């Protein structure tokens, strides 16, 4: 499965929840996550997508991830449809108990 297929599945999954998954490009800052995801319960996530086999974070992507986590923001690295399904399932649970 290609990364673009995973990305399209993420967009579809987020939109079925009523959220948005915007493409994130920053010309002056390499390593930023692929998508900023805003969910209806107020959660905002920085989401990096990689292909299932061999997809690894580049050094600048790891630095970005560490900075996002240090700032106590939400970050996810998703590599396949199953992980996206689990991630959206966890969101649904948080929404029910939150």
Tell where the protein language model's regions lie, with residue ranges.
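Catalytic phosphate/metal-binding cores of nucleic-acid and nucleotide-processing enzymes, i.e., regions
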Residues: 1-98
């Amino acid at each position: 499965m290609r990364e673009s297929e995973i990305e399209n599945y993420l967009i579809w999954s987020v939109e079925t929840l009523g959220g948005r998954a915007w493409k994130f490009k920053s010309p002056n800052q390499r390593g930023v996550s692929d998508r900023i995801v805003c969910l209806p319960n107020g959660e905002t996530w920085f989401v990096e997508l990689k292909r299932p086999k061999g997809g690894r974070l580049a050094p600048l992507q790891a630095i970005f991830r560490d900075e996002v986590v240090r700032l106590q923001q939400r970050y996810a690295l998703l590599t396949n449809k199953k992980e996206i399904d689990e991630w959206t399932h966890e969101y649904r649970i948080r929404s029910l108990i939150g």
